[in-house]
Amino acid sequence: MSTELENVKKQEEEYSASNIQVLEGLEAVRKRPAMYIGDIGEKGLHHLVYEVVDNSIDEALAGYCTDIDVTINEDNSITVRDNGRGIPTDYHEKEGKSALEVVLTVLHAGGKFDKGSYKVSGGLHGVGVSCVNALSTLLIAEIRSRDGKVYRQTYSKGAPTSQVEVIGECSDRGTTITFKPDESIFTLTTEYKYDILANRLRELAFLNKGIRLNLYDKRKDDEGKTREDHFYSEEGLKEFVQYLDATRGTPIIDQIIYLDTERNGVPVEVAMQYNDSFSENVHSYVNNINTIESGTHLTGFRRALTRTLKKYAEDSGMLAKLKFDINGDDFREGLTAVVSVKVQEPQFEGQTKTKLGNDEVSAAVDQAMSAALGHYLEENPKDAKAIVSKVILAATARHAARHAREMVQRKTVLSGAGLPGKLADCSSRDRSIAEIFFVEGDSAGGTAKSGRDRNFQAIMPLRGKILNIEKAQEHRMWENEEIKNMFTALGVTIGTEEDSKALNLEKLRYDKIIIMTDADVDGSHIATLMLTFFFRKMKELIENGHVYIATPPLYLVKKGKQERYCWTEKERDTITAEFGKGAHVQRYKGLGEMNAHQLWETTMNPDTRILRQVNIENAAEADRIFSMLMGDEVPPRREFIEKNAHYANIDA
């Protein structure tokens, strides 16, 4: 037996109660759950699953687990099963109870804090499965142990309701956790969304090549069918970039640039590809956590990319005739990249604690990236020339866009920030209560103007479909009248004291920006164009929770003097049955079919309306979907629409 295999065997045998370290008690979790899982809404609900899956991923990173199954049960409980070593069940001397009970009842207890057990660990909050236990009315832990026995213990709201019991024998090893979230804590929803879990498991499969992640949904849809997906990646980040790039135009280089190395004790993995699109699509991860606020690892990547490409471009003489400087943005136009690092003790900063602060990681990524990219450019001169040509085109377009933008912003200042003529503004200047509706067409705009509360609601009619930002270079955006009017109406500009390219929200005039369109194909297209614009050019508005979609009712059911609005077919059928014989159903195909009073009552009145807040649960997946919906590739768009058509309710 080799020394390496002996060490793995020894470590496997020694993973027991003594490896479990305890940092903190569980008392506070039920009192302040948002402190531990982010929030008690949909995001926090799904975070419970991630905490349990992270334990299994940690086992995989340590080399002991290859398969992880996640099942959404019919009652919206979750079961996570892995084939790792199994949580130890032996007696924990210091705590006076089994190691299993320590892991499940003490916050931050786990082998991941013991450097002898796990080298690195995921888990943004790092609170472990005990937090899941505290926030569940039922948790069942089943351990297939190394002694060939199956151990079981049950819990409720963090407290054990049984002893650790032997319930059978087994020939394999692993952990199975089943939990049911507490409805008294998750008051908004306890219903798991398949797509949110699927996106995260897909992401984890790409980030951890060689691990099989399976998702099963035992809940039946309207046709009596269940769902399942299986995620496995042989090539990891290379396949991740291919997946993200499949909807983003045509690659301009022959192969994906890839590196997987270690610098100064920091494992660094990068995959990148250039295509002919006009936007940057770079995603970064630390220990499998999506660092949406970037951090030192991304700083190192960008610095190395700019410096290495610029040096090659200068040495090749391709920049000799350029009459203006190129900058970092030019080197990243059309770039799709994933940067993943593993850090033993990550320091997270920023508003959402998703910004890496470790200084040593920047140098590690910079060194690794410089060496790999420099070698690639020398070995592949054809690809190198294609990349530099793309950079020069990007610089030329940026120069034209800056000139167009300055003209627009200068004109706005000189004209005293005159608002667009079509804007029916609200009288309040209190941004915290003000809201603006972007409405499809002058007809619906007229109804909305009549129905609104002019004290705090502004109406901005849109003339037809706005520019498709996904396919347009930036200077075209600044030449587009509708988009210029949107910037002016919102009071948003480009450039802050810290960053001349950042979105400036200081003079944002409204707290809520509401997209209100018809429930038909054209209306959905306009809404998607608007969302693409906000996602690509004003992402901070989405991240700060300002963007919403109005949901007008689809039906009005009437019988005599009784009338009820319905937003779904199921609701319509229930009300129709309730009203009985003689009920009349009206289908609303457009906002213009409602009068001002009806539009106010159903869609604009804060007390009765239904607004859907736009948020970015998964930045990489959101980017891919926008590229697919608004890009040039038809087959993936058709496949997406066919797969998701039953979630939509629009008339073709």
Regions found by a protein language model. Give the residues of each.
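A short glycine-centered beta->alpha linker in the GHKL/HATPase_c
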Residues: 86-91
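Short adenine-binding "F-helix/F-box" segment of the Bergerat
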Residues: 92-93, 100
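GHKL-family ATPase ATP-binding module
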Residues: 1-19, 26, 48-50, 58-60, ...
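Conserved short strand/loop->alpha-helix "switch" segment adjacent to the catalytic nucleotide/phosphoryl-transfer site
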Residues: 31-50
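Glycine-rich ATP-lid/hinge loop adjacent to the conserved G-boxes
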Residues: 36-40, 111-122
